[in-house]
Curated annotation (Swiss-Prot):
Protein name: Non-lysosomal glucosylceramidase
Origin organism lineage: Eukaryota, Metazoa, Chordata, Craniata, Vertebrata
EC number(s) per entry: 3.2.1.45, 2.4.1.-, 3.2.1.-, 3.2.1.46
Membrane topology, as annotated: Peripheral membrane protein
Effect of residue 630 to W: In SPG46; loss of glucosylceramide catabolic process
Catalysed reactions listed for this entry: a beta-D-glucosyl-(1<->1')-N-acylsphing-4-enine + H2O = an N-acylsphing-4-enine + D-glucose; a beta-D-galactosyl-(1<->1')-N-acylsphing-4-enine + H2O = an N-acylsphing-4-enine + D-galactose; beta-D-glucosyl-(1->3)-O-lithocholate + H2O = lithocholate + D-glucose; beta-D-glucosyl-(1->3)-O-chenodeoxycholate + H2O = chenodeoxycholate + D-glucose
Gene for this chain: GBA2
Amino acid sequence: MGTQDPGNMGTGVPASEQISCAKEDPQVYCPEETGGTKDVQVTDCKSPEDSRPPKETDCCNPEDSGQLMVSYEGKAMGYQVPPFGWRICLAHEFTEKRKPFQANNVSLSNMIKHIGMGLRYLQWWYRKTHVEKKTPFIDMINSVPLRQIYGCPLGGIGGGTITRGWRGQFCRWQLNPGMYQHRTVIADQFTVCLRREGQTVYQQVLSLERPSVLRSWNWGLCGYFAFYHALYPRAWTVYQLPGQNVTLTCRQITPILPHDYQDSSLPVGVFVWDVENEGDEALDVSIMFSMRNGLGGGDDAPGGLWNEPFCLERSGETVRGLLLHHPTLPNPYTMAVAARVTAATTVTHITAFDPDSTGQQVWQDLLQDGQLDSPTGQSTPTQKGVGIAGAVCVSSKLRPRGQCRLEFSLAWDMPRIMFGAKGQVHYRRYTRFFGQDGDAAPALSHYALCRYAEWEERISAWQSPVLDDRSLPAWYKSALFNELYFLADGGTVWLEVLEDSLPEELGRNMCHLRPTLRDYGRFGYLEGQEYRMYNTYDVHFYASFALIMLWPKLELSLQYDMALATLREDLTRRRYLMSGVMAPVKRRNVIPHDIGDPDDEPWLRVNAYLIHDTADWKDLNLKFVLQVYRDYYLTGDQNFLKDMWPVCLAVMESEMKFDKDHDGLIENGGYADQTYDGWVTTGPSAYCGGLWLAAVAVMVQMAALCGAQDIQDKFSSILSRGQEAYERLLWNGRYYNYDSSSRPQSRSVMSDQCAGQWFLKACGLGEGDTEVFPTQHVVRALQTIFELNVQAFAGGAMGAVNGMQPHGVPDKSSVQSDEVWVGVVYGLAATMIQEGLTWEGFQTAEGCYRTVWERLGLAFQTPEAYCQQRVFRSLAYMRPLSIWAMQLALQQQQHKKASWPKVKQGTGLRTGPMFGPKEAMANLSPE
């Protein structure tokens, strides 16, 4: 809230080594006599069922690749491909085809409950799409369909992303901030050309596609001899070229570098091709990288697109390539396709060709001599509706049994952006280092090609401690790093903050707000690619572990922004879709649900979410308090704590009104008033009540740190009364009841009932003198969840269902109680690890990873939710970043063994050394 098959085995392959011939296929171009080339023979491949039985091969990741590599028929392992990650044969087909959650998946009883909401939503949706001509923040009518094609995205944090599928296609685009286009651009390809003794013997597009355009190109690569391996932020694709004794390994690199606030912002990606000649003949190898200017279709409509070659030499390093200028308003950009020039390589180009034609001119140009013609000058700007593409080619000679390297980069420069309301101009973070003028694409390309080796060293230093830890399962190593894709590909923006854009009157009590935002910028990521709201705070509660552990300054920046928004109000009244009630957009001293919609003007207009009036939600204020203390605890930043303390006091004061009977425990309001916004909660509840007690306990700690004895005494009294009420009203001997209402489902086992304890333990609290929930109750509840929500659900193979009835049947009382929420499961697993149930934690989390990444084909688009059968909901969602809470729990367990912090009796305050980033993350961060 995962794409195709490497193929035509090529040219000049002896008949005994061919798979089958596809010359009759009208979509495959089979040149005959062309100057300087031999007859180029095209081969094709059929499925294993047609010609050979499927078999396991020893080339798979021996620990973990499972069924995803069954189809692989090659023997090549590629050049320096790591053993851990997500690996899949390009010929693999996922058999299970699920559909997005729709109204027809709602039970009759739940549909009756939500009929008013449905009618109001339809009315609002029609007005938004047909009258305002805008896109809904959640489009329940047109969900993104299943496409099991996605791989690692390209691009750093906040500069836009381009996702390359696991079959090599460029297929998901987020260049305009927060707005996604799911379109495979056929012209965006890599093509290989092999020449022996001055003649081309093999030329193949490295794509399984057989498109209706560019038909002169040799498409239909055989996927049974290639595989993809992802370990974000890097990915490898290995192509074995049967009959050629050549193996290609393409390594894709993006600068995602923990604790780095410069290179991590760059909108670039690097492709390093390592070519291995396993034969006894010398050969010439060329790789051509072709790229369309824009995405085609409506993207071409305005016209005025043009390309030009460039060459940039700095510090003895030369980079050549093409600039693809896309001046379409309101967010014009320039794309750069470039290659590094070395003593062993030749870089050539073709400035412009028609990507909607047969492509014969480009194909013949490469076929003729393995190089492109390299015309000078810029192309003519296109007419309206006409497409344009270009290509860059790198060539090198390869000795018998030799190896060579060809290096490409892809960069895009969109320095100034406007969100959908077109009200303000914003500058991306990378402009601090590369300028705001829109002419940085050559410099970005040069920088990427000269620095990628250093990036890889830093990535390896960061990841190696986890990858080398033999106590950790292989699936976890893949999940931990690959789920990080969302930090860059979550519609993410990282913006410069202008000094005059911060309101003086609101920020005057936060002394370090301005320096933080000035030095580290403003960060926003979507709740999900389909749930278009920035920094959705009830969900960020789960996802924030990745940010605080890897880019803590961005987490603090986000917290300052949230504090600013909390102190503001917007009394504009609007109708909320669930209740139909008119209420203000935002009330003062309550945490907003989100910071805004990228199709509007985020940060200026918050709370794009209008299903519920979240001013009455019970969890948002509590989650702010808990995250503030957690962030202080892990960073040791006392200035941050001092700045946030008054805001914490204000939001807790707002929360007090929900304790209507003054027993020290808040009550839910009889509707879905928390992150489970389709699951009604009444009275004291396990989830919100637990978060409340945890937040009160944290207030006691912060009051002591801030020297506020009266406030410390006040919250200590509330905590004492609340603990007694929580245990009396909710504990049943095995777990905490869902809520304390008289409804049958009030005794449901909620998988997320220990969320408060989870955060306390992450903050070094929740045991000994700071115990809030009796340890034996917490452990017993977790054991019950494991027995019922995990093992009694789907054979224990799909994670933990949100709600389970005590007799082992999923709770179907709401549209969310019988879902599995991946991010909640990872948080639950972290809680289990914290409480010593490490085996249970890994078993629980593994079910989600196997389901999403190996069974449903949802790699790099992990959804918010799935049910036991048929459906998923909200692809590419923020919450699964909570897997980093598992890593924190593991590190804290290791830290405990090394040095347990001392606790002063009676206060619960640590007097020992701070468990901060240098200690907590020593095995992850080279810094």
